[in-house]
Amino acid sequence: MLTKLRISKLVSYTLPRRIFQRRFLVTNNTAEESPIVAAESPELPSWIKDFLSNKPSSSSSSVSKDDEDFVIPSLANWVESQKFSRQQVSEGNVVKKPVEDIDKVCDFLNKKDTSHEDVVKELSKCDVVVTESLVLQVLRRFSNGWNQAYGFFIWANSQTGYVHSGHTYNAMVDVLGKCRNFDLMWELVNEMNKNEESKLVTLDTMSKVMRRLAKSGKYNKAVDAFLEMEKSYGVKTDTIAMNSLMDALVKENSIEHAHEVFLKLFDTIKPDARTFNILIHGFCKARKFDDARAMMDLMKVTEFTPDVVTYTSFVEAYCKEGDFRRVNEMLEEMRENGCNPNVVTYTIVMHSLGKSKQVAEALGVYEKMKEDGCVPDAKFYSSLIHILSKTGRFKDAAEIFEDMTNQGVRRDVLVYNTMISAALHHSRDEMALRLLKRMEDEEGESCSPNVETYAPLLKMCCHKKKMKLLGILLHHMVKNDVSIDVSTYILLIRGLCMSGKVEEACLFFEEAVRKGMVPRDSTCKMLVDELEKKNMAEAKLKIQSLVQSKTMIDSHSPLSVS
């Protein structure tokens, strides 16, 4: 449980007996940085501190000048020594780190943006030993660039002593599906199926296929893949497989197709409790509460008892509508039926109350949790930190963050992402960078940075025109196998446009287009308008030409978003 020193003082203003009883909360609007975070955080290198403060460094006469000297990293052939030479000299680090195989491969993959056939030819000069772990790492780094990923995949399979496994095939299938190259995706699945002895096509393979089809709005294709997978690939169409399909359809906003599958297969594939919970969640998500209730009644008729997952779907939907009266009624109904809310339920309620600016009630949720003997988890902490930060209580948020391990709860990537966003929201740029550095020291993969980790940091760099720090962060992303996706390009293009860095925005736009990611509509218009304002006619024509040529080649580009 959380210590009284940390949590109890937060709810001492309220101490509600019912979680929705209205009280006032006295907020702490201090801007003081948490001494706990400051004391335990690792020291930042001077070259990052200089970028944040715009002070001259000991090894550079003008950081601001360097900060303007921006060259977009190609995300692979970045010359590390060029960018980090000052750090190496100042720290006396004269020993060069050997170039890792992953970096050698990435150097080749980013030499030019060409077809996957050309990538295969280029890699013929690459002298690395191919292993399964190397293949998986490369596919993670290029999960948004199917040409490079697929070219490397083909080349790797031709190397002496190496044969692709089911894991690497599935990873490549997922990349192709993510990039919506479905024809090539199916070719690869059929290639996997030729190896009858190994049985490479599994439910994991087909689940990735169905999920990617559903995500692209190809709901009928996803259903067809399920119906054909036993006959064509020997993958059993059982309850688990049906649930995988229905879950994909519901998550991608098609409860109608999921319900249709359920009705069609009801007599041939026996549903289980998860089947009903998927449908109930889908109906609640679509605000079809009568249908959700009817499904819960059918669940009971088929001798399955509604559980905490069932009720939490209703709670979440009512929370999103801001109908806390019905939320309270649902919580009471749960208890009457012998089903206590769990930490997921309480986290949803607390987060929604905080979002509705009912902060006293939100913090009061913890008291109710204690009554039920419910122990907070990492997601609960993340929500609590977010609420405290948004209400000006950043010092409390930082203390709660630091106290997590004392309470036996490990910080994960979601908690770090929330804390980084909170630090930046309160102009604690240096603390945010410390947190990013601390993530590397956490054990396990649960704290590996993801796109959401970097997004607010990149946004800060654009807003404050920290061009060199922006480059360092992009490099850091690649080193952590975080693929630059279309959303990141949009963030960069729009952020740089708003900061007057139009030339840099053009560079990112060009790179996105070369990789098949075309930010259309509002993003493109913003860039063109900014170029027009600055009388950059030549650059404007180039951007318009890029978009038009790409549109002609692929008028239905699956990666085009606004």
Swiss-Prot record:
Protein localization: Mitochondrion
Keyword Mitochondrion appears in the UniProt entry: yes
Keywords per UniProt: Mitochondrion, Repeat, Transit peptide
SUPFAM superfamilies named in the record: HCP-like
Coiled coil: none
Transit peptide residues according to the UniProt entry: 1-31
Gene Ontology CC: one annotated term: mitochondrion
PPR repeats: 165-199, 202-232, 238-268, 272-306, 307-341, 342-376, 377-411, 412-446, 450-484, 485-519
Major localization listed first in the record, in broad terms: mitochondrion
InterPro entries: Pentatricopeptide_rpt, TPR-like_helical_dom_sf
Similarity comment: Belongs to the PPR family. P subfamily.
Name of protein: Pentatricopeptide repeat-containing protein At3g22670, mitochondrial
